[in-house]
Amino acid sequence: MERRLVPRSAELMSQQDTVLLVIDIQEKLIGKIENAKRLVWNVRRLLDGAGELGLKILATEQYPKGLGPMLSELAEGIPQIPSKMMFSCRGCPETIEQIAGCGAHKVLLCGIETHVCVQQTAFDLMASGYRVYLAADAVGSRFRMDHELALQRMESSGVTVTTTEAALFEWCEVAGTPEFKRISRIVREPSPTSFADD
C-alpha cells in the first residue's frame, strides 16, 4: 500500500510560489548600515540560492543619483534594477507588475533600511494580498533600535520573519537531489572573518 504524504504547509515558501526582492542595497548607504558585511554576505547567498533554484529575482534602487547604484557584487545577473523616489517598492510599478506576472503569491524581502523602504514595502505588499517573508539577517538599518523595532512591528502585523539559511532550505524542500547539493554548498560557505570589523 502506497503511503501518502500529508500536504505541505501553506506557511512554507517554495521555488514555485516565491519571489526574491532585494531592496536598495546601494554604494553610498551600505557603509552606514550596522553589520553591513554580514548583510551583504547573506543577500549574496540568497541571490545564489534563488538563481540555482530558478526563483524570480527582482531588485530596486532608491534615488541612485544621491545614494549611488546597487552594489556591483550583488547586481550581477539582475537584468533590470528600476529606481524610485517613493520609499516603498510600490513606487516601482514595473517591479510590482513582474511579481504579479510570474504568478507568485509570496515575496521574500531583503535589503535596507529595515525600518524605511523594507518595512513600507512589506506592508504595501501585504495590503495587495501577498504573503510577505523577511530574512532578518539580510536586512539592516543604520541604528539597531530602528532595525529591531521594525522587525517587531512587521512580525506583529503578519510578516513572517525568517533567516537566510531557513529560506534556502524551504525553497529546496528535500535532500538527496542535485539542487540540494548546490544549496548545501551555499549554506556551508564559511562566513568571512571580517565580520568582526562590522
Predicted regions and their residues:
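Active-site-adjacent betaalpha module
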Residues: E2-V19, E52, K65-D198
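N-terminal nucleotide-binding beta1-loop-alpha1 segment
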Residues: V19-I25
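Short acidic, Gly/Ser-rich segments with clustered Asp/Glu that frequently serve as metal-coordination loops
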Residues: E27-K32
